[in-house]
Amino acid sequence: MVDFKTYDNKEFSLESNEGNVGILLSGGLDSLLLLTLLCEYFDRQRYIIFTIDKPDGSMMWTEKILDYISDRFPTNEFYQQIIEGGDTDEKAELGISGKVGFSDVLRNYYSNLGILYSGNTANPPVALDHNTAEPDRSAALKAQEKWEKFTMPF
């Protein structure tokens, strides 16, 4: 386990796993940072990268991220799974409501993972002028409570 402290004194930790390490890679900065930190501190891991195909086009960045990470950390293994379903809402039998793609990861891949990371971040402590609405993290927070191996370190 590696412990970190941010510039504003928030603490988080990351841990390796003997099994597969799952990561929800959106193509954004948060999940890129998470994957980079994991690879920097934990060598010779097998990473299962889950990218949910959403209509916002963010998936195009995940290929570039994986090319960069694979070159920089060649002793790790990377396997990408493109998950269909995008932003469609679903109330699944999993006990949480959320997006179809995320439900698919929990339903079909979770049991083969030692840990599943998400780069979701907490909402900003202050409202920003350009935001139209606060991001809704409730489904991910409920999943973190319900699914023992699912974690959002940020």
Residue ranges and their predicted role:
Residues M1-F154:
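ATP-dependent adenylation/nucleotidyltransferase module used to activate substrates
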